[in-house]
Amino acid sequence: MPILPKYESFWAFLLIACLIPVLAISVSNLVAPSTSKNPEKSTTYESGIEPMGESWIQFQIRYYMFALVFVIFDVETVFLYPWAMSFDDLGIIAFAEVLVFVIILIIGLIYAWRKGALEWS
């Protein structure tokens, strides 16, 4: 039995997944009005005031640490929600797996807390 027919649906979905962005960008380029190459239109303009000085500002690393911790726990929520919706069907094994997952995340949170990543001062 050839292996190729087994993956027909995969290749079809892969082709569709590649064609949708290409078609969306092509249609957007065809339908969108032409833009002028005026350099004034590419300048920074906010709240009716022309910017003064350099626009590059260095952010403190604390912002990135908070963002990283937020992303970690946001991803945790994304993984836990489908599990919670099908909790009755999955059984005790899935509960043990999720418990290990949450324990690993709690250990990571304690590590970040002890390293001072969550302190603002």
UniProtKB/Swiss-Prot annotation:
Protein name according to UniProt: NAD(P)H-quinone oxidoreductase subunit 3, chloroplastic
EC number(s) on file: 7.1.1.-
HAMAP family, per database record: NDH1_NuoA
GO cellular component: chloroplast thylakoid membrane; NADH dehydrogenase complex
Reaction catalysis annotation: a plastoquinone + NADH + (n+1) H(+)(in) = a plastoquinol + NAD(+) + n H(+)(out); a plastoquinone + NADPH + (n+1) H(+)(in) = a plastoquinol + NADP(+) + n H(+)(out)
Subcellular locations according to the entry: Plastid, Chloroplast thylakoid membrane
Family: Belongs to the complex I subunit 3 family.
Gene: ndhC
Protein origin, superkingdom: Eukaryota
Keyword Isomerase belongs to the record: no
Molecular-function GO term, any one: quinone binding
Function as written in the Swiss-Prot or TrEMBL entry: NDH shuttles electrons from NAD(P)H:plastoquinone, via FMN and iron-sulfur (Fe-S) centers, to quinones in the photosynthetic chain and possibly in a chloroplast respiratory chain. The immediate electron acceptor for the enzyme in this species is believed to be plastoquinone. Couples the redox reaction to proton translocation, and thus conserves the redox energy in a proton gradient.
